[in-house]
Amino acid sequence: MHLFGVANWLIKDTIKKQYDNVIFMARDGYLPMKAYELLKKIYKNAPKESYLYVSRKALIPASIINRNDLYKLSEVLNVNKYTPRKVIKYIKSCIDSRKNVEEILLENNIKMDEKFKSIVEFNNFMSVISNELFDEKKNEENLSKIKAYFNEFFTGKSCAFDVGYSARPEMYISKLLNINLDTYFININHEEAFEHSKIGKFDLNIFFDYKPTFTGNVRELVLSNTAPSCIGYNTDKEKAEPVFEESIYEYKELWTIHTMQKGALEFIDDLITIFGESIERLDYQKYYISLPHEMYLQSATEIDKKVLSCIYFEDDLRTDGHINVVELWNNEIKYHNQHKINELLDFYSYGNYKTNDEKIAEAQSLILNNRSKPIKLIYYTLFDRVTLRRRFKEIFGKHKIIMFCANVPYQGAKKIKNMIKGRK
């Protein structure tokens, strides 16, 4: 339902605004494009769709218009995870190949394989690249070929679709091609998306009018193409060509993702078969049509999450490695302190509602579970004197001497406490 809602919103709005082309960007634009293609059976005058191989990695060279742009890479890279050698891998298209890079860096006390410890170190490194290694002519030739490659897609009145979130890639492309690349997002995370749209002078259209709790990993995974990711563009030939990394998925991962995607597309195909052209008149709110999808992301049971436990999420730019999707998922739930929907329903349902006293008793049982008697005595003395008196009576009620000996210091301590509080 969520996929149908997104694709139907996109196709109706792009027809209304009379775009000629819709360019689906990056791997997570793949499944929305497939849904868009299905809906074109109903919407005959829909803009032409195309798929652009692009990623944050691939766009790094395109973002370096001049040497000053080198310093902006810290906005894209988690610099503490990187060494000069790894950064150079992304910016080699603007470095003078006639010079010995490692030797020049060593002369400036920069070691190729030592991670940056601060943004200051990173900027010092970029200063050396800018002043001693930057090849302006080579960079211009590289940009010219990338620009020609992108221009093949952005003809006529074009717009882009992406899951989200920052609009930085769209800003880079807008500046490179000198166009206003109007963009459609499912959601954004921060106001920086609007800042980038102002810089790029393009309109930003957003499916959700709120920020979902969960963005990234799982949301992107189920929408993404399982083909290898584009990691750059080969400009050695006359015409730029996308360069792909090796496939990161094994059969079990491919089967899981393809099965989920196949089901989503079959659902849309069934809607088309059942409703036909009446789909254009279906009345619904975007929030509610996406609610089952959002509930799954926020409130999936552990057994439902296990479906994706064989998959690892790749994010070299930020985390410098591969992380299990379910681990990321659970971490995000903990980070946002989110309750699952069934927990909220249990809390507010009449039969399962717990009073504050019941909640306190439940918390105490967890705190004191398997604790020694001295620890329990200290806890009750400090925090729960009612339980302390009750337990003493239960254990020593028949021993009057012990009860008397315990009561004297207890009453004395109670009087001192009341005096401190100003009571009589």
Regions found by a protein language model. Give the residues of each.
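Long, low-complexity, Lys/Arg-enriched
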Residues: 1-424
